[in-house]
């Protein structure tokens, strides 16, 4: 190659490098400028929220699960809502899903960490729990089977069960990965293989397991914090029905609002050991909000509400044995109502049966994040939007993601 051509190519390479560096520098400047603008806007929005006068406005929260209690915390923290104007209606602990193992992912756990940071006596304690003992790591024979599964088209897996696929490597059913899938996704050996494959795409480790006792301790700290803030926790109380108003009859959901709540409260007659009940009708005024864990009370209230409007989801998709909701069916995504249904003026949903674009619906992260999403959108606090557009992956990115998923499962000691 002549010297002149070499010099020309060198000049072109240098120019290309300088152009790329200039482009990266410009992009970083714009990114920093946007971050500063966002920070300034956040400060202004926070000041506006702090200066609000809520007057006689009230918040009614249905259910005393982790997500319901978290909603009360976010009302106080993000919206500076007076605790004395918050009412939480709940049944017993088990009925509200507070009795089992709680799984926490370290990915996207900012909301969970921030919530725990608001509770005296929690904080680091929650994140120093040892991983549940008894499980084993993935073996060398398990990883190739997982790789083949992730690379197989889903349409070819519908007729197979998880046990069929791993019949040659039964060791996987003794690992922490399988325990995690049972806790987070409710999978069994005879579960559909395509559903198991979809679950693997959602796993981002590492995960921590909170025992039922540790979960109860977190719930206790939440209630203790809320009582100090003046929140009225009405236990042994059930919201049996609600009355909805739809300001637009064309089915779009515009103007959807809760107008009345019907409450049944249990009393105990000490002298006779008989149960007595008090029934109450609550009228919601303009500005009042209603936040519902639609899985509480076996989903009976959600079923009644869903019959009134299409925007409130399809609880029938989750009905299992004994006509009870099965929260361990996370992939009925479109059957879940958004944390704030389209057009809703004062109704929000939290918990495993509400819809967020990201996250495993049976983790502590999801419970806390759904509560924050519903509260901030209903109260226009601006902390976070309820959802984002789904991103499409190219074939190359898909293979890279497969590799990352398998590697993360192995590194997570699952």
Where are these regions (language model features)?
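Glycine-rich active-site loop/strand segments that organize a redox cofactor
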Residues: 33-44, 91-111, 153, 185, ...
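Short hydrophobic core segments
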Residues: 62, 239, 282-295
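Conserved flavin/dinucleotide-binding core of flavoenzymes
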Residues: 27-45, 281, 285-286, 296, ...
């Amino acid at each position: 190659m002549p010297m002149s051509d070499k010099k020309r190519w060198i000049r072109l390479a240098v120019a290309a490098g300088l152009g790329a560096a200039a482009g990266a520098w410009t992009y970083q400047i714009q990114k920093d400028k946007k971050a500063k603008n966002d920070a300034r806007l956040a400060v202004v929005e926070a000041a506006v929220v702090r200066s609000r006068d809520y007057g006689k406005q009230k918040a009614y929260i249905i259910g005393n699960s982790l997500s319901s209690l978290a909603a009360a915390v976010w009302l106080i923290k993000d919206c500076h809502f007076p605790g004395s104007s918050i009412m939480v209606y709940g049944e017993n602990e088990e009925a509200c899903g507070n009795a089992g193992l709680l799984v926490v992912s370290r990915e996207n756990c900012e909301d969970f960490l921030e919530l725990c940071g608001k509770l005296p006596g929690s904080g680091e304690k929650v994140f120093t729990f040892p991983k549940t003992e008894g499980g084993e790591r993935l073996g060398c024979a398990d990883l190739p089977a997982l790789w083949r599964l992730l690379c197989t088209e889903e349409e070819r897996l519908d007729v197979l069960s998880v046990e069929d696929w791993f019949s040659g490597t039964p060791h996987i059913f003794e690992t922490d990965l399988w325990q995690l899938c049972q806790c987070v996704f409710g999978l069994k050996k005879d579960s559909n293989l395509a559903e198991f494959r979809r679950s693997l795409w959602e796993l981002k480790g590492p995960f921590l397991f909170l025992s039922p006792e540790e979960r109860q301790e977190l719930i206790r700290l939440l209630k203790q914090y809320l009582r100090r803030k003046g929140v009225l926790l009405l236990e042994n109380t059930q919201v049996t029905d609600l009355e909805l108003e739809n300001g637009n009859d064309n089915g779009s959901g515009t103007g959807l609002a809760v107008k009345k709540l019907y409450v049944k409260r249990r009393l105990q007659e000490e002298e006779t050991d008989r149960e007595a009940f008090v029934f109450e009708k609550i009228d919601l005024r303009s500005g009042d909000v209603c936040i519902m864990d639609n899985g509480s009370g076996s989903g009976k209230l959600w079923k009644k509400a869903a019959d009134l409007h299409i925007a409130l989801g399809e609880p029938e998709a989750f009905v299992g044995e004994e006509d009870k909701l099965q929260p361990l069916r996370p992939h009925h995504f479109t059957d879940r109502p958004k944390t704030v249904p389209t057009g809703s003026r004062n109704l929000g949903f939290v918990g495993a049966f509400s819809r967020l674009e990201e996250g495993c619906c049976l983790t502590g992260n999801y419970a806390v994040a759904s509560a924050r999403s519903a509260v901030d959108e209903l109260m226009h606090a601006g902390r976070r939007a309820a959802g984002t557009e789904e991103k499409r992956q190219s074939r190359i990115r898909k293979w890279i993601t497969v590799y990352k998923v398998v590697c993360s499962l192995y590194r997570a000691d699952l």
